[in-house]
C-alpha cells in the first residue's frame, strides 16, 4: 500500500490519534506500507513494550524497530515485499507473532451485503470470534456490528485488555473486523467501543459462542474443533418423519432439576448421566430446556438472555452441551430449547445502546421498552437485528442439532400495545396495533427452519387469539408447528383448584377447550409458570385432604393425556412436588421415599406408555375426526367422557373422568364398537395410591343404544379418577 507522504503532518496526526486510542483508520498508518523508494515501512502499536524487532519465519532478526516519539509506536524498514514477523519484548515475556495489520480483509463484501439484507446464515458464519486460516497461519477473526461507533477495538487476555492495542477495520454496513494471529481457545475478550459522542463502552460479543461464568461478563473464544456427533440415525429419522408421532415433553430447568453435593447446578456430563435415563424411563419423547442461552441473572430463569449464541457457562463448555444433546439422541429423546427473541435486559455489557445508540432496540421507549419486565424490545424492522436473531436460531439447530425451538412471549411480539395503556404505544403504518415487522420476522423464522431443517419443531408461547399461529405461511399464518394452549391450561387448572362440591357450576371450563381444540396445532402445557409466585406445586393446588389432592392430580393428568393436543409437563409435577419451584434449589426428590409420590410417578410413566402404544391418543391430536364427545353435559356429577379415534382405523379409546369424590356404578356410556373393551388405565388403581375401584379389567358392550351409538358400556366410575378403556381388536 502506497503511503503517499507517510511523514506528512496529516499522517503524523492520524498516527497520534490511533496511538492515543482515538478514532481513525488504523490500517492506514499501522502495518507495512510501501514508501516512495520501494522499501517497506512497518509501524507497530505496542503500548508497554520495551523493544521490537522484525524477524523472518525462522526467528532471524531482519531489523530492529525504533521507538517513535509517539507513545507505544515502533517503526522499522525492510526491503520491498519482505516477509516478516514481530518480536515484541514485554517486561515479562518475549512474544513472536505475525502483524495483524499486514492482513487483508477476510470477510467477503458479498457477505456484508447479505448481513445488511437480513441474512441470518451470513451473520452466523461471519460475525463473532471465528477461527480462520490466513494461509497456513491459525488465527481468530473478530467481527462485530456497531454501525454508529467511531472506533472499535478488541481487548482481551491476548493484549492485556489494552484498548489502544488492536483497533479494528471498519467495513461497509457498520461491521468492524480484525484478524489476530495465534489467539488461543479459551481466551477472554470484549469490544471497546467509542460512541458517536465520545464515550467508551466495554461490550461483550453479541455473537460469542462461549461466555464467562456469570457474574463475570467477558466473551470467550470457543474451540474450533468440530464435535464428533454420533446421532446420524436420529437426524435422518427426524428429517424423514411425516407421520404423526407421540409428543410428550418434560420441561426442565437445568440448574435446579437436581444439584450436586455442594448445592451447585449439575454440569452437562452429570445431567446426561442422570436426567437422560430418568426421562427415558418415564417415557417422555422430548426434553424442553428453559433458556440456556447465556444470561447474567439466574433469577430470570434464562428468560433475559444476552448471549443468544452461547450455552450458559453454568453447566460447562459448549462441547459439553453438544455431548448432552448427542446422548439424548442416542437414547431416543429429542431436545427443545426455550428461545427468547422478544426482549433482552439492559445490562451495561450487553446489547443495550450497543454502540452508544439504539442498535438492537428501538430508540423510542414506546416501541423499545417492556415496562412490565423492564427489558428492551428488538427492532424487528432492522435487517441486521433480524439477521442476528435468525442466525441464533440456526446456530442452535445446525450446530447443536436441537430438535425444536419454543419461542417465548410471542404475544408480546405481535402487539404494539402489549402491556401498554392508551398513548403509550406507536401504531403501525396502517394505524393498527399489530407489530407488522415482528409478524414478518416470525414468518421468516418458521419458514427458514421448515425449509432448511425439516422435522424441527417451532412452538409458539402465544396467549391470545391471534389467528393462524400454526397455519401455513402461504395461507396467511405464522407457520409454527405448534402453539401452547394457554386457554385450556387456565380453564382446566382453575376448575381442578375448586372444591368438587363447587365444580358443577363451572363444568364448561372442562369442555370449552374442545370448541377451538383443532383451530391450531396445540400443546397442552402444565409448565413452570403454574408452580411459582406462591402458588405451590400442582399437588398443593388441588383441594381437599392429602388423599384427595393426590387423586385430583392423578385424574387431571390422565384427562390431559387423553385430551387432544400434545403434552408438556414441568419437572416435579410427575411425582407430586408440594412446594413452589425454586430456581436456586433442587426438586424435592426425597418425596419419592413416600408411596403416594411414587404412585404419581408411576402414573406418569404409564400415561406416556399408553401414549406410545395407543395410536388413537396421538394420531388424531390435531384433527377433528380424532375426537368424539360421549358425555359433555353431566355437570351435576362432574363427569365427562369422550372417544379418541385413530384416523388410520386403529382401536378407539374411551376416556371417562369422574371429578367428584362420589363413585358411580352402572354409569352407561355409548361406544362406537361392539364387543370387548379393556380398562388399560385407572388413576384410582392401588398401584398409584388409589382406592382400587374399577371395572375388573375387561367389559363387554350391551345392546343399549346411547350417545349416538347402538351399543354401550356399563361402567363403574371411581372417585376423583380418570379411566381409559380401549376397544379390543
UniProtKB/Swiss-Prot annotation:
Catalysed reaction equations from the record: Transfers a segment of a (1->4)-alpha-D-glucan chain to a primary hydroxy group in a similar glucan chain
Pfam family of the protein (one): Alpha-amylase
The EC number(s) this enzyme carries: 2.4.1.18
Record's keyword terms, sorted: Carbohydrate metabolism, Glycogen biosynthesis, Glycogen metabolism, Glycosyltransferase, Transferase
GO function terms (MF aspect): 1,4-alpha-glucan branching enzyme activity; cation binding; hydrolase activity, hydrolyzing O-glycosyl compounds
UniProt pathway annotation: Glycan biosynthesis; glycogen biosynthesis
SUPFAM superfamilies reported for this sequence: (Trans)glycosidases, E set domains, Glycosyl hydrolase domain
Assigned GO CC terms: cytoplasm; cytosol
UniProt record, GO biological process: glycogen biosynthetic process
Annotated active site: 408 (nucleophile), 461 (proton donor)
Gene3D superfamilies: Glycosidases, Golgi alpha-mannosidase II, Immunoglobulins
Entry-linked InterPro entries: A-amylase/branching_C, Branching_enzy, GlgB, GlgB_N, GlgB_N_E_set_prok, Glyco_hydro_13_cat_dom, Glyco_hydro_13_N, Glyco_hydro_b
Regions crossing the membrane: none
Subunit structure as annotated in this protein's UniProt entry: Monomer.
Annotated family: Belongs to the glycosyl hydrolase 13 family. GlgB subfamily.
Matches recorded under HAMAP family: GlgB
Name used for this protein in its record: 1,4-alpha-glucan branching enzyme GlgB 2
Annotated organism of origin: Xanthomonas campestris pv. campestris (strain ATCC 33913 / DSM 3586 / NCPPB 528 / LMG 568 / P 25)
Gene name of the record: glgB2
